[in-house]
Curated annotation (Swiss-Prot):
Its main location: cytoplasm. It comes from Aspergillus fumigatus (strain ATCC MYA-4609 / CBS 101355 / FGSC A1100 / Af293) (Neosartorya fumigata). Pfam families: Isy1 (PF06246). This is Pre-mRNA-splicing factor isy1. SUPFAM superfamilies: ISY1 domain-like. The gene is isy1.
């Protein structure tokens, strides 16, 4: 507490710039690559320190969970700093494998993408069983599978051999076959909905104008009508509470 008081006192007197000693929250506001490198290195030191501490046998399960959450939060912050460094034209630390190294070049186990479990967090109740079940099935841990699935969902689209059809710019509408198929399916869906019994509708539901065969076109309500409806609903709720 005394150190913080003295630091704040020095900042008020203009002796030190407290903005240089406190890590910025708005990472995208930092437009200097050396500054980003500095803060990234600080985050890596914190990660390395917490990964070492989570191995201690004296920690309770609650402390281990909190530490593991803090490490994952720092991992996300590290990724944000690396994104900012890359956007500013600096080195791309995200290129290559998902391995993570501290500021001294030592690999941090479990430091890939997604939520990870470090040290004794892998022995927590529920987590340990999850890893054992994955080992019995001969599969990788769930966290690694999630990372692999993320790549398969289009994360590596730049390396795939795709053409304009993949993005919906094909020529399948020029001959009219696709449009005819869509019209047929739309007609079948409308006939199916019309064939449904009225009793299937929930209480309080009303058909939209035009859907009930009254020939009235559906229109968006005005702002005044919406406000009037909301006021009316609130008034009804208040009356129900009073009664």
């Amino acid at each position: 507490m005394l150190f913080r008081f003295r630091a704040q006192q020095a900042a008020d007197l203009g002796i030190i710039d407290i903005g240089r000693t406190r890590r910025p929250k708005a990472i995208t506001s930092v437009d200097s690559i050396p500054s980003c490198e500095k803060w990234r290195g600080q985050v890596l030191k914190e990660i390395s320190r917490k990964v070492s501490r989570i191995q201690e046998p004296s920690l309770s399960d609650y402390q281990i969970r909190d530490l593991n959450d803090e490490i994952n939060k720092l991992m996300r912050e590290k990724w944000a700093w690396e994104m900012q460094i890359r956007n500013l034209g600096g080195p791309n630390y995200m290129r290559g494998s998902g391995r993570v190294y501290d500021d001294e070049g030592r690999e941090i186990p479990g430091g890939g993408k997604g939520y990870r479990y470090f040290g004794r967090a892998r022995e927590l109740p529920g987590v340990k069983e999850m890893f054992e079940a994955a080992a019995r099935r001969g599969r990788r841990p769930p966290e690694e599978e999630e990372e692999e699935e993320g790549k398969g969902r289009g994360g590596d689209i730049a390396t795939k051999k795709v053409d304009a059809n993949y993005f919906g710019y094909g020529l399948d509408e020029e001959d009219g076959s696709l449009l005819a198929y869509e019209r047929q399916k739309e007609k079948e869906a409308v006939e199916y909905l019309r064939g449904q019994k009225d009793s299937d509708a929930e209480d309080g539901w009303e058909p939209l104008p035009g859907d009930a065969g009254d020939g009235v076109e559906w229109r968006l309500p005005t702002l005044e009508e919406v406000q009037e409806e909301l006021v009316d609903r609130r008034r009804r709720r208040l009356l129900d509470k009073i009664s």
